[in-house]
Amino acid sequence: MDSTPRHPVVLAVRNVRKYFPIRGGLFSSHVGDVRAVDGVSLDVRESETVGLVGESGCGKTTLGRVILRLVEPTSGHTYYRPTPEVMGRLDSLYASLGDDNGSAHKPTATSSAALKELDEIAAQYSLYRRNQRKMRELRGRLQIVFQDPFSSLSPRMLVREVVGEPLEIHHTGTRRERDQRVLELLQQVGLNPEHLWRFPHEFSGGQRQRIGIARALALRPEMIVLDEPTSALDVSVQAQILNILKRLQDEQGLAYLFISHHLSVVRAMSRRVVVMYLGKVVETAPTDGLFSRPLHPYTQALLSAIPIPDPTTKRERIVLSGDVPSPAAPPPGCRFHTRCPAVMPICSKVEPEMTAMGLDHYVACHLYSSPEKAAPKGAAGALAMAEEAPRAVS
């Protein structure tokens, strides 16, 4: 999905799904699924921050955990360090198979060959094919900082033990070397040596999040999933944490998957943004392109809610009607059609495919891929920002 040559890819997520089974009845039989993540693809490159945004319940946090295999996926793959040649082949194979990945009832010879090649690539690159020993080796390279700094740290452990635990688990260095490394990590996140001998409850929320960041850095990772790292903090403390994360990225070349519902923070931190709705990606683009010209009606509604720090400037607010459907019973066709101000008849019947709308800008919306483009009168406000959008790139 990310075609512009830049830094090498650390993780390539392809068609990942995570369904949580619903059980009911006398024998607790399987009666349905909660489709938390439903066919998501994205790339995270070296030294790059990818923002992942969407309303609460859209599947952002679940996706972050599935990518790192903290939660096992239902299907799909996360490829670690695929070469440019493998990346090109992956995209070609997935495109040839379509959304069903060749899982039709009567697979053709072509789809069978593609599936076989994908299986061979997955055996070499996919995290989900690694055994426990190989996954442990990768844990140090792929880390996560959790949203809640109050519950992510053990209350019974000293800071010295919390930050040093990854080093002990991976048998890194001698005891003295580990202690020295812990001290360096605390200094990198702005804490002092005397903090080594304190318990987490003795710190503020911002200080606890610094401890969580130090722990994630212990094994010198290549990528960190940041699961709303500032949402539980005061605004002044948020700025401090974001500055630390930016500095660490500049110094160490870290890749971030930055999960947040705070769009202004995502704009400041990210190079690319992925927008999710009800388990699906609806739009992905470079940050400047997404914020200057959002194409999907859902993205437009999200951005219209950002406050403007100028009382003389007004922006038309796009207010969505209705509630978010349940991921246990998503609507047919486009999942956003029940709330979309630009809905068309095709939207409730056919699920839109990702359409290229410019350099690295993709949108899943029938407004840009369907000949049926006559929107209802009430859609004028929602489409105002997309009227000058470029035509689809073939």
What do these predicted ranges mean?
Residues 2-9, 22-28, 33, 110-114, ...:
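Short catalytic/signature loops enriched in Gly
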Residues 55, 65, 69-73, 223-233, ...:
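P-loop NTP-binding/switch modules centered on Walker-like glycine-rich loops
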Residues 76-88, 95, 110-126:
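Conserved ABC transporter NBD signature motif
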Residues 176-194:
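Conserved ABC ATPase "signature" region
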Residues 199-203, 207:
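Conserved ABC ATPase signature
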Residues 218-222:
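A short, proline-enriched helix->beta-strand linker immediately N-terminal to the Walker B motif
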